[in-house]
């Protein structure tokens, strides 16, 4: 039996069965034992359960094994030498050697003075295990090679990674930094620069598929990347890849394009590290979620297996906690923390324990490193604004850019999370401001007003910002068709983020125009239609197709769309229906829901009302209905709500504006019945509300039925909730409905019981705000991308977007700008009380500079140097010159040949053992 491992394969998930009872092929046993680096497997006969056996047995014939057994690992042999060793003729050998090379059991080069072709039996990793996995058809026919590759990057290492010194001891791969990140480093070595290796192998480059991406996907743990062309063979390896149908030649310019696209995606550059400092044969662009090489440092928590000579450091004074470095750091070395000191001084952040002076075993590993490395924030918290925003926009970052006059950069930063900043600058409920630390001193920073100013650029075609498409593919835009049902903020947001990933989604909207509740549920005096249209135009420029006047479930079904080639669906139709009160008389003429009123007026601002109007409800929608009623001609408007004045759901600002316009508000009552005459409402009888919630905290109002008042009226507008109107959309689908007829879905992926159907926005959460829908749309796009890419995990390495607010009660706030909060002016040419035009102006540029200076700069990124692998990806994402690489670990650039690995390991191991003993004595 094979030696037990601390991290066994989950055989239930393998795309094949391990042939444990197979009759052993002796030549394969010998070959596996000869090549493996796994010490236990060298000291005993292989069994059918050993990956060295079943991996080779699946693809290597006995004839191939015969030849390979006459060779030695990594010892080149020319054809004449192989002829002599095997006794076969050259005519017999050449086609066999070619086949062995195409399969991946052999490689070849011309690295000798005569430039004579010589064949090499490579080690498993890096070597034949990768080569086996560079051909899709071969993987399909021999899926065993995928798990073989995975095992050979784990089993030989699980007992030695803690003993590997800086530089990697000639094992596997080695991180090489982003070139731009070390251009100004005077002490850098040539071998630390990608440009050095490209010059060394000038004119000899080939691009091939990534074996990690291919094999992991075949095992059901794909990352959603297109695997083709991310790995670059250099020198003679380029010829080998091309001649054995694993790659194609590329030019220097194409190499640079691949490297740039890799950096755009946050992939890590790595070079082979088994031939010393004078040779590499590949430059890989690695995704940590699938890379078997990066796993050697991340899973075992042994960074020496990967790290370069560089460590990232944050310049705290420049950092604004935008979180871009955090999102892309492959090692989870950067997290958001705080810049402001606590009352007892700066926070001292924990560091990852290292194996240098500690016994190291499975209890020190991070089996779930792909998820742990996506933790965004230290438990002690970070900037409250970023935490409170449902979309977690980099508020502190765009305020700093605005303060510097970098308005376009600020807009670009916002649009990494929010495609509708101009819309949100007018109607957001501003949870960021509610959480703002400045509000504990005087007044919160006017974040939304600053965003509105920044986003004005989007309203002009000449100045609008259209983000670049960044997709994890080098093969052009994705071909998969995706349908989004519903053109509101969730659906449009999903479409936007899919477009940024290289898709061309189609939005189906039943109304004449897109926008959903933004257009049909928010009056123009708060959000003008041209603002909505301007930002939707940007989606169209990105390639989003919007088909209006199409009700899915009626004109066309989901089944029809599937038949038309659509691979995934995002249902985001919102809560477009209004709820009734369930009291006598509510079917009378003159009674309508707020949703209906707002939709009617959204279509026709000349809609007329007259007489006395009562609006039932206390939220922002009720406020909108009241204000719209006055603009439509109502003589008087009274709002009635269950809540006390200080408990009304509507914002204080909205309440104040409504009252200023003439709306009367009566709190603490609910409808008992509607009085009618000749089928028309004439009055509403109200009953006193005595309580809102039951002992479990659920909304369950109680009343005193004897304490009533009667309000005469000619119109009633019900704003007591919204409902989902599914129509025939779900007919024949497996989508399940839960409370309030909302769709039941996975809380992380938003995937329903119908696997290709995802949901988002109000149909999942119930009625919420636009920014909630926007955040949900982005997560929907993440899920759909993972779903439509073959064999991709829906959750592994997924950013869960969890943030924590710093303790505002434990801050030592020093000097700060004492400027008061700025207020935007009102256009005096507009009748702000009765016009449907938006009278609110934006802040002036002078005001924006003054307002952004009020930001206290609460948050900052924090690097754990014990986790940093020195890739430099973080530096490519920072737009504040706040994070740089420093050459703190020059010993990590020591490259040795694989054959000399123990010459490097043994001295380090001895020193480590002494440290461990001293550490024990110290305890």
Which residues are covered by each model-predicted region?
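Beta1-alpha1 glycine-rich phosphate/pyrophosphate-binding loop at the start
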Residues: 393-396, 402-403, 444-448, 484-552, ...
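Glycine-rich dinucleotide-binding loop and its adjacent helix/turn
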Residues: 454-475, 534-554, 578-632, 737-753
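Iron-sulfur cluster-binding cysteine motifs and their immediate structural context
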Residues: 72, 76, 83-85, 103-112, ...
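Ferredoxin-like iron-sulfur electron-transfer modules
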Residues: 88, 119, 270-283, 299-328, ...
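A conserved FAD-binding loop/helix module that cradles the flavin
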Residues: 763-788
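FAD-site-proximal beta/loop scaffold in flavoenzymes
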Residues: 587-610, 694-767
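Flanking helices and flexible, charged tails adjoining ferredoxin-like Fe-S electron-transfer domains
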Residues: 331-384, 445-481, 500, 504, ...
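Short, amphipathic alpha-helical interaction segments positioned at domain boundaries
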Residues: 115-154
């Amino acid at each position: 039996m094979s030696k037990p491992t601390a991290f066994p394969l989950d055989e239930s998930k393998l795309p094949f069965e391990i042939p444990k009872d197979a009759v052993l092929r002796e030549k394969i046993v010998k070959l596996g034992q000869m090549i493996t680096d796994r010490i236990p497997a060298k000291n005993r006969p292989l069994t059918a359960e050993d990956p060295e056996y079943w991996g080779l047995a699946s693809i290597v014939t006995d004839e191939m094994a015969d030849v390979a057994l006459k060779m030695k690992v990594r010892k080149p042999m020319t054809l004449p030498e192989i002829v002599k060793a095997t006794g076969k003729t050259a005519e017999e050998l050449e086609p066999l050697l070619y086949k062995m090379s195409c399969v991946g059991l052999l490689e070849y080069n011309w690295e000798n003075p005569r430039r004579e072709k010589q064949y090499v039996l490579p080690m498993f990793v890096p070597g034949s295990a990768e080569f086996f996995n560079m051909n899709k058809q071969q993987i399909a026919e021999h899926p065993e090679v995928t798990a073989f590759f995975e095992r050979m990057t784990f089993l030989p290492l699980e007992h030695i990674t803690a003993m590997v010194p800086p530089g990697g001891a000639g094992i596997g791969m080695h991180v090489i930094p982003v070139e731009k990140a070390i251009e100004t480093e005077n002490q850098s070595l040539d071998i630390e620069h990608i440009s050095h290796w490209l010059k060394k192998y000038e004119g000899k480059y080939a691009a091939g598929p990534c074996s990690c991406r291919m094999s992991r996907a075949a095992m059901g743990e794909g990352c959603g990347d297109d695997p083709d062309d991310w790995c670059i063979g250099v020198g003679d390896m380029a010829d080998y890849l091309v001649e054995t149908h694993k790659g194609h030649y590329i030019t220097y310019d194409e190499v640079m394009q691949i490297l740039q696209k890799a950096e755009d995606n946050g992939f890590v550059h790595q070079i082979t590290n088994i031939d010393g400092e004078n040779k590499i044969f590949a430059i890989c662009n690695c995704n940590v979620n699938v890379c078997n090489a990066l796993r050697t440092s991340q899973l075992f928590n042994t960074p020496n297996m990967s790290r370069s000579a560089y460590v990232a450091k944050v310049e705290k004074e420049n950092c604004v906690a935008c979180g871009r470095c955090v999102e892309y750091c492959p090692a989870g070395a950067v997290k958001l923390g705080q810049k402001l000191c606590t009352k007892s001084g700066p926070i001292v952040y924990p560091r990852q324990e290292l194996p240098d002076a500690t016994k190291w075993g499975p209890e020190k590993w991070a089996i779930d490193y792909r998820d742990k490395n996506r933790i965004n924030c230290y438990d002690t918290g970070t900037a409250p604004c970023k935490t409170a925003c449902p979309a977690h926009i980099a508020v502190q970052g765009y305020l700093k850019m605005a303060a510097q006059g970098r308005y376009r950069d600020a807009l670009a930063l916002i649009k990494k999370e929010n495609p509708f900043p101009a819309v949100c600058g007018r109607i957001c409920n501003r949870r960021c401001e509610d959480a703002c630390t400045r509000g504990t001193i005087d007044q919160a920073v006017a974040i939304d007003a600053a965003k509105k100013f920044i986003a004005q650029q989007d309203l002009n075609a000449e100045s609008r910002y259209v983000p670049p498409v960044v997709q994890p593919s080098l093969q052009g835009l994705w071909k998969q068709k995706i349908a989004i049902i519903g053109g509101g903020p969730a659906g449009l947001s999903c479409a936007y983020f899919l477009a940024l990933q290289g898709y061309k989604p189609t939005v189906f909207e039943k109304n004449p125009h897109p926008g959903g509740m933004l257009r049909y549920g928010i009056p123009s005096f708060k959000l003008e239609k041209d603002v909505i249209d301007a930002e939707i135009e940007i989606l169209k420029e990105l390639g989003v197709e919007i088909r209006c006047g199409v009700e899915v479930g009626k004109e066309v079904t989901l089944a029809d769309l599937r038949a038309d080639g659509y691979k995934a669906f995002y249902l985001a139709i919102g809560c477009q229906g209004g709820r009734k009160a369930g009291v006598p008389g509510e079917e009378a003429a003159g009674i309508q829901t707020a949703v209906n009123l707002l939709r009617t007026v959204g279509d026709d601002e000349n809609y007329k009302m007259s007489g006395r109007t009562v609006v039932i409800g206390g939220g922002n929608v009720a406020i909108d209905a009241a204000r719209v009623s006055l603009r439509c001609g109502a003589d008087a408007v009274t709002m009635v709500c269950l809540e006390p004045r200080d408990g009304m759901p509507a914002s204080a600002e909205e309440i104040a504006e409504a009252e200023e316009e003439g709306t009367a508000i009566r709190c603490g009552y609910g409808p008992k019945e509607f009085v009618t005459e000749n089928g028309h409402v004439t009055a509403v009888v109200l009953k006193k509300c005595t309580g809102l919630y039951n002992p479990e905290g659920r909304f369950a109002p109680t009343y005193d039925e004897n304490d009533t008042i009667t309000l005469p009226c000619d119109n009633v507008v019900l704003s007591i909730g919204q409902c989902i109107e599914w129509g025939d959309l779900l007919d024949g689908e497996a989508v399940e409905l839960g409370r309030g007829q909302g769709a039941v879905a996975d809380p992380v992926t938003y995937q329903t019981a119908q696997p290709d159907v995802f949901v988002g926005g109000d149909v999942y959460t119930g009625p919420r705000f636009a920014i909630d829908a926007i955040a949900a749309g982005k997560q929907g796009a993440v899920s759909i991308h993972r779903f439509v890419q073959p064999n991709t995990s829906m959750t592994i390495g997924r950013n869960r977007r969890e943030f924590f607010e710093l303790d505002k009660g434990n801050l030592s706030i020093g000097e700060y700008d004492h400027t008061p909060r700025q207020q935007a002016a009102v256009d005096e040419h507009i009748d702000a009380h009765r016009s449907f035009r938006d009278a609110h102006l934006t802040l002036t540029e002078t005001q924006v500079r003054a307002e952004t200076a009020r930001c206290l700069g609460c948050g900052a990124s924090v690097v754990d140097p014990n986790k940093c692998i020195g890739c430099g990806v973080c530096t490519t994402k920072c737009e504040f010159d706040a994070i740089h690489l420093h050459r703190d670990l020059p010993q990590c650039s020591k490259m040795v040949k694989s054959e000399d690995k123990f010459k490097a390991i043994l001295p380090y191991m001895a020193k480590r053992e002494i440290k461990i003993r001293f550490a024990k004595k110290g305890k």
